[in-house]
Every structure is written in structure tokens, then in C-alpha cells.
Amino acid sequence: MKPIRVCPECGKYTEKHTCERCGRRTEEFLDGRRRLALSKLLSGILRHFPEEVKVKLDDEGFTDCDVHELAERIKKYWKNREYYRWLTGEHIIAVVETCPKGRFEIDEHGRIRARYGHSRRLSVRPTLPEAENVKELYHGTARENLESILQHGIKPMGRRAVHLTDDEREALITALRHTRNPVILVVDAERLRRHGLVPRKAGKNVYVVEGTVPPDCITRVIRNPRRSVESEKR
């Protein structure tokens, strides 16, 4: 993962060496290794195990403290806290503002939440905008799951919702995290709506659907997604 840089003039966080806002040369703020580790830790705390750092989440998924207090609780309570002695609230803000998928959100009180991906055991249901104009969505999975999915649909498994994307390449990247033999399922969003399933926008290219995506909403299977994505780039 790329380092996060900061503009010394306007304070904008970016991956670029020149600030898009004011044109100044940026300085490194958080190296790529720490950025990746912190992003994964935030995902874990905000989606699955907030109690491990003495944090409570409300119904919308927001923490009971601001990001600066969250940094202090991580340094005090997290089991591997010795690796996070450097952490401040500003590092959390930087990770949120530069997250390519828009996984996190900070409200006007400085509280943070994950926008999607929560475990079923947490009583969290974030309010997310309905994706009214999206027509086609993608879901990447392993080839060995295909027969079961075409028979039973795409299930949320341990999560509250099925994750989809409007970007075929993103679906491939997601699938490749779990398998060497990916396929991409193409989902008709209008058919979802006819089933009473509402696609909601949860991140920059991420959409969620509460419940199982029925098999008849899967209109196509891209069996060689690498070739498909490469041909789109040409």
C-alpha cells in the first residue's frame, strides 16, 4: 500500500507528491506498512470486535468516542498495542480520507464508523442512500462456489449484507484475495428491486443488499474475468 502524504500548506492527505488543492509538494505522513495495518485494525474494530478496545457502537455503527480518543483506547487496550505507540487521531483521519473504497466515515462530532461489512452479532444497521440509478452490479467469487450460488443465490454469510460493486475490476480484485480461480457474477439491479431488495451505496464503488441475492437476479457469469478486465483496458 502506498504511503499517505500531507500538504504542509493546506493539510490535505493524499497519495500524490503534489497537492491537488494548492500545488505544493507534499510530505510523507504515514508509511505504507503502517497504513495497511491501521486500516485493517480499524475494519476489525468497527465491523467485528469493538469491545476489544473498550468501544461501543450505536445503531448506525458510530463509536462512542471521537477518533482521538479511539487512538488512545487502541494504545491502551488493544492486545498488540505495543505496535501502535505512534498512533494519533490524525493518523486515523488520514486513513479515512484516503481510503480508496470509502470504507469509513467520520461525522461532525469526530466519531467514526465503518459504512458496511458488520458482523451479524452486532446490532448495527447503518443508514445508507438507495442506489436508484445503478443498473448492473458485480460480485467476485471463487469458481468452486459457482454451482451453489447459481442454485441458492449469493448469501451474506457472516455479514448483514451481500457486497457488490459497480466496477468489474474491483470485483476481480476482491475475488483474488480469496482464490486463484475467480469468476464474476453480473447482477441485475432492477430485478433485485422487483424482489424487494434495495441496493444501497456504501462506499465509492461498493453497494450492499440486505438478504440473499436470488439466482434469477444473476444474469451472466464472467468465467475468465482477467481477460475481460484486460480487454476493457485496451
From Swiss-Prot:
InterPro entries: Ptrans_KptA/Tpt1, RNA_2'-PTrans_C, RNA_2'-PTrans_KptA, RNA_2'-PTrans_N. Keywords: NAD, Transferase. Gene3D superfamilies: 3.20.170.30, RNA 2'-phosphotransferase, Tpt1/KptA family, N-terminal domain. Its EC number is 2.7.1.-. One of its GO terms (biological process) is tRNA splicing, via endonucleolytic cleavage and ligation. GO terms for molecular function: NAD+ poly-ADP-ribosyltransferase activity; tRNA 2'-phosphotransferase activity. Disulfide bonds: none annotated. It holds the Pfam family PTS_2-RNA. Transmembrane segments: none annotated. It is an enzyme of class 2 (transferase). PANTHER family: PUTATIVE PHOSPHOTRANSFERASE, TRNA 2'-PHOSPHOTRANSFERASE 1. Belongs to the KptA/TPT1 family. Removes the 2'-phosphate from RNA via an intermediate in which the phosphate is ADP-ribosylated by NAD followed by a presumed transesterification to release the RNA and generate ADP-ribose 1''-2''-cyclic phosphate (APPR>P). May function as an ADP-ribosylase. This is Probable RNA 2'-phosphotransferase. It comes from Methanopyrus kandleri (strain AV19 / DSM 6324 / JCM 9639 / NBRC 100938). The gene is kptA.
